Structure formats: structure tokens, C-alpha cells
Amino acid sequence: MQLIVVSGRSGSGKTVALRVLEDLGYYCVDNLPVNLLPQLIVSVESQYDKLAVSIDVRNLPVSADKLETLLAQVRNEGRVEFSSFFFDAENSTLLKRYGESRRLHPLSRKQLSLDEAIREETNLLAPLSSTADLRIDTTSLSIHDLSELIKTRVLGKKENELVLVFESFGFKYGIPKDADFVFDARFLPNPHWIPELKPFTGKDEPVARYLSSQPDVMQFILQIENMLATWLPHLERNNRSYVTVGIGCTGGQHRSVFIAEQLAGAFRLLGKNVQIRHRTLDKSTPQH
């Protein structure tokens, strides 16, 4: 049976995630007390082959060690194919979402301000965040974008296979929080300053032809490829479900896009399960 544990800070998109997983055929349980997870698995494994469970900050064990031990037990005992998704967003975004929805934060009963509750929740959920197979930052995602991203991650994954995600981005918009590795391409030649190349992206032939003619660019790609190829077997043996590689340039339109596309193509040729995302291009904004 496949099991996905959904967690994250309140307001970050857990409810949307659970709704998408239900549409994908998962039997979903919202806000399950963590200590009931082993019993739930036993009770439903003969009826369902896909289970998704949402864990809320209100239903955590008192001890963080107990939480880590319980999840490790479920992950390692072999009854389920275990994956965990952690959803998050910037504090300012969470504050804005709560202001718009006028909902109470789950920790508001502790007589904390909203800002204090959000920060306290961060500490309480740290064990789930640090051990998640996939972290998704929803700060700049619409509900539709988040739904499509979850579908891509879930449907694009084969059983017990590591998914390698290449993600281009612009440093001017911030580093993606879901990245396991981040590479900075801002020192490389920038097509933005070449008038005839500026309107294009790293997916277009004129930019690709220019960047592929730059020795530093190609050496940078080769060295990233060699590093990942060296360590991916170790990550696979460690039962990782996802590895997200962030490639950043100034605005996320030219260099980072080209490099992410080149790396994705190289690892597809090696038979890896590869997904690609261009954060700036996906917003459809003309940044460089």
C-alpha cells in the first residue's frame, strides 16, 4: 500500500493537497493523531492500496523524539511504501492568507498572536519538515498551480523510484525552499545583455545556441552532472523519494532555464525519472 503523510504549517496548502490526492484515488484521513497511524494502516490495508494522511500541529505527540520514532517505524517496517510531503510558505504569506480568510490559527487557543502562533508552529513541526521526502513552497503558487504540481509529483513517480526534480529560478525572487541543492549561475555570460537574445528564454534555440558555445557554461553543467551522478546512488539507497536541484540566475529566464533543461536531458538519457520546473517562466512574467 502507498502511504503519503501530508504535513506543513497551517495555511500552506495541506487541505488543497489532500483534496488533490483524493481525486487521484487516495483514501484520505484529515488531522489524524499521529499515534493512531500504525493502527490505521492495519485497519485499511486490505481495503485500499493508496492512503493519504494529514497531520495537524494539534495532533502531535508531546515529545519530538516520539514523533520521529513513530514515523521511522512506519517507514522502515515494510508494510507501506512511505512518502512524506511538507507544505510551507513565507511567514508574510501565511499572515496575509489568515487575514483574508479570517480563520483562527490552530494555536490561537494558547493566547498567542497570529505571528507568534506561526513561529511556534514552525518549531513544533520541525521533525516533520526535516525528514520530508518532498518540501513544497506555496508562497507564489495559486490553488490551480499547487494542484497541478502535486499531480505532477505523484503521477510522475514510479514505485520505489527516486524522482530527480530540476528547478530553475531567479535569485531576485528568492531561493526556492524546496531545493535540496542550489547552484548559482549568475557569474556566467548573460544573454539578457544581448539585445537580440533578451526577448527569448533558455528554452529557445537562439539562447541555447549562444550558451552552449560558452566554455564556462558547459563546464558548469558538466561539473553539476558529475556531482549528482556521484551521489545519487547514495540518496537512492537512503530511500529518498525526491531530490530537488535548484539552478538560479538573476531573474530565471535565460541561464538557469538552459542549464536546468540540459541537466534534465542528461539524466533522462541515464534512465532517471526526471521532472522539470521553471519558476519564473511558469509565472509567465518577462523577467531576465
UniProtKB/Swiss-Prot annotation:
Q: Give binding positions for ATP.
A: 8-15
The Swiss-Prot or TrEMBL record annotates one GO molecular function as: ATP binding
Q: Which InterPro entries match?
A: P-loop_NTPase, RapZ-like, RapZ-like_N, RapZ_C
Question: Could you tell me the keywords of this UniProt record?
Answer: ATP-binding, GTP-binding, Nucleotide-binding
Q: Which residues bind GTP?
A: 56-59
Protein purpose: Displays ATPase and GTPase activities.
Q: Which family does it belong to?
A: Belongs to the RapZ-like family.
UniProt-recorded name of the protein: Nucleotide-binding protein ASA_0318
Taxonomic placement = Bacteria, Pseudomonadati, Pseudomonadota, Gammaproteobacteria, Aeromonadales
